[in-house]
Amino acid sequence: MKKLLKISISIILILGICFLLFEISKSRNFQFFGGHVNKAETEEKVAALTFDDGPGVNTEEILDILREEEIKATFYLTGQEIEQHMDDAKRIAGEGHEIGNHSYSHTRMVLKSPSFIKDEIEKTDDLIRQTGYEGEIHFRPPYGKKLFFLPYYLSKHERKTILWNVEPESHPEIEGDANKITEHVAENIEPGSIILLHVMYESREESLKSVKKIISSLKEQGYHMTTVSELLKHQK
């Protein structure tokens, strides 16, 4: 009986630890090593519009929208898609937008070896430089997942993990409607917010449609939209 009790307690502890690590891996407020940012601590009405993945089929359209609205944004691109769409990536850089590293293969970087993480980041850094982009390269983990080795690598290289605090597409009842996406952003925006959208693929048509609406809505609220690097300059 005592042996069975010990086994049961051990199983419960293991499951508890696994659950805790899972929650930590997706947390936007905690990581084991280094710095992370999900918003800038400021009272100024500034916010960053960020796009994950790509370059993809909608790159030209989103760039046309941003140019028309005179907005600079941050694009977290994957290495594989930069290789496939180098001309689009070069246009992103050429039009003065910020490019961040979103890994090479868009694999969850949890329970991966240090060598895998190093290769994913450094290969993509090299590809980003090939676009002509000369600014600081921030890193955003795929799916926002990080645990031990990724934060440790970034901290050793004095790089922060860039996350977000406004993500309308995470709500199934919102993601398929451009107006609802816009409303969610307008209702949840605050000084220093980092907004996450996915607009690069055909399946994200409603997200793409929401971009102009979001920009217009935030301008009406008195917000200035900028890149993540510029946003961080407003930190208290």
Regions found by a protein language model. Name each.
Residues E61-D64, D87, R91-G94, D119, ...:
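Alpha-helical scaffolding segments of alpha/beta enzyme cores, especially the outer helices
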Residues K6-E23:
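Hydrophobic membrane-insertion alpha-helices, especially the h-region
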Residues D125-W164:
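Domain-start "cap" segments at the beginnings of catalytic or binding domains
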Residues G34-E41, E68-E69, I82-E83, E205-K236:
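C-terminal domain-boundary segment and adjacent tail
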Residues R28-K112, F116, E120-L127, G135-E136, ...:
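Active-site beta->alpha N-cap acidic-glycine motif
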Residues M1-L4:
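N-terminal Lys/Arg-rich, disordered targeting/topogenic segments
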Residues N101-S103, L163-E167, I194-V199:
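Short beta-strands and strand-loop turn motifs
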Residues P151-E187, Y223-H234:
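His/Asp/Glu-enriched short active-site or ligand-binding loop at hydrolase and phosphoryl-transfer sites
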